[in-house]
Amino acid sequence: MERVLDPQKNKEPGKYIPLPEKFILKQNRPNPFNPTPRIHYRIPKDTQASIAIFDEKGKKIVVLVDQEHEAGYHHVDWNARDRSGNVVSGGVYFYQFQSKDYVKTRKMILLR
């Protein structure tokens, strides 16, 4: 997980980026993907949050992040591997963002 932007300052002196007003889980890019999708998400306040990947049958494949997050703009990449490090097959997968105040699931497609 990487924090994309300092929520208070831009790289340009004197320019400020406001904190997000609400939770947002964006569609991964690229989609379809091969080999690595990037998942962007926004968090309006400091909170514990997780992002997990599920197969089309609902089986949890891997947890990408499960930790305390600062408010701001974040992203995480998935290497298309399961929790044991095995490469997963092509197909439909779902990623789910979950915090105390927000749950959102989106679909992505892995091409092999």
Predicted regions and their residues:
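C-terminal tail/sorting-segment detector
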Residues: 2-8, 89-112
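A generic beta-sheet turn/junction motif
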Residues: 32-34, 57, 99-101
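Solvent-exposed residues in well-ordered beta-strands and their adjoining turns
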Residues: 42-44, 81, 98, 111
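Short, acidic, Ser/Thr-enriched surface-loop or helix-capping motifs
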Residues: 55-56, 82
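Surface-exposed loop/edge segments in extracytoplasmic proteins
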Residues: 59-65
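Short, surface-exposed loop/turn motifs with a glycine/proline- and acidic-biased composition
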Residues: 65-100
